Design a protein with these regions (language model features):
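Cyclophilin-like peptidyl-prolyl cis-trans isomerases
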Residues: 2-3, 9, 15-198
Length: 198
């Protein structure tokens, strides 16, 4: 989500759970595995193709193009999210394989939608309805916020790396706990590993 949108969600959070692991399995359909090599270590994702096919196709397509390689995590909101996927590093850019912004995939019957924004959830960041490109965020805590952002995956390995990214010193931009890392945290390489059926 872009900064103006995310801060609105932050203000309506009614509580944070103290979950210490990643979310439980949420999909029973086709999934895609992703490896993100960062300057802090490796993060592995499972993408929910059955829940959000267009979003997953976009992420996979961009990864195969090498788009994410060298991009930073441009935003950290302590206890909430880390955010990346913008080649400008500002939170105002992005790209999609469709050549334009694309629509949300918010299906109330999808398992991931029902699960909500749990620790380890991977979802699309945007500046409003149907404005998705390449920016995404990873949840640091369970947050009961409105389901306005397409959930398309979860962290399966490397949540400790996500936490280490979240722990770095930031340049505050939206309060003392929300801003850009003082030292760039880079996605060195994003790789599509395999496809699997669950």
């Amino acid at each position: 989500m872009y900064t103006t949108k995310l801060v609105v969600c932050l203000t309506i959070i009614v509580g944070l759970s103290q979950s210490i692991g990643c979310q439980s399995d949420t999909t029973k359909g086709k999934t895609v595995s992703i490896s993100i090599e960062t300057t802090k270590g490796n993060i592995e994702l499972e993408l929910f193709e059955s829940d959000a096919p267009k979003t997953v196709a976009n992420f996979v397509g961009l990864a195969e193009q090498g788009y994410f390689n060298g991009i930073i995590f441009h935003r950290i909101s302590k206890g909430f999210v880390i955010q990346g996927g913008d080649s400008t590093g500002t939170g105002r850019g992005g790209k999609s394989i469709y050549g334009k912004e694309f629509e949300d995939e918010l299906n109330p019957v999808a398992p991931s939608y029902k699960e909500g924004y749990k620790r380890g959830t991977v979802a699309m960041a945007n500046r409003g309805p149907n404005t998705n490109t390449s920016q995404f965020f990873i949840m640091l805590s369970d947050v009961p916020m409105p389901k306005n952002y397409t959930i398309f995956g979860k962290v399966t390995k490397g949540m400790d790396v996500v936490d280490s990214i979240a722990a770095v010193e930031i340049i505050p931009q939206m309060g003392d706990t929300d801003g850009k890392p003082k030292v760039d945290i880079v996605m060195k390489k994003v790789t599509v590993k395999k496809e699997a059926g669950k």
